[in-house]
Amino acid sequence: MIHCIGDSHSAVFSGEETMQPCWPDPAANKLPYFKSYRIGPATAYQLATKQPIIESLINSLELTSEDYLMFCFGEVDIRAHLIKQSKIQNRPVEELVVECVERYVESLSVYKKYNIPIVVWGPIASWCDQKVYTGGPSFGTNLERNLITKAFNTTLELCCIKPQFEFITIFSEMLNDDGTTNGDFLDDWEGSHMHLSQRSMPTILQKFKSAGLIK
């Protein structure tokens, strides 16, 4: 079983076409491969502050040697913080991406103590003009956010090598030829349009199968 711990972007792994409740309320968990645990709003940059709730969650699970812990964070950083902070701090956004990712991976390394393989889910392509997001702060154009997402995922994949975390993402599969997001992958929920729809699940499952994480 792959235990998916994350912000609202963990909801897709429930197998249900709707947002899931926050843990400890249970998600729908309709798929045989995943269990989804939404811990509420969180950023990759400040994930260390969520250690108490994440540890409580993990300690509540009956983990076996066949299980995985997967972490799903980073979209909020890309959409709401990195471009904004680049301007505020007058620093290249690429520099902030590296700083954010390094902090994220460092915070995840704490959970190696459970001796369960760790999977890191790379942030998805950002919301697009095809399906406008009106639910909260967002900076930059779709293409700008996707370029940052690409840099974030590239850096994240590299940073996962040393701690031996499995990295997996469908970011590239979500892009149109011009680098914008194919909105068909995104949800149709009122005020959202920035989470994955269950329409993306075949692509997700193929990625996990190719990585040998599911059969």
Predicted regions and their residues:
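Surface-exposed, active-site-proximal loop segments in enzymatic domains
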Residues: 79-93, 128-140, 184-187
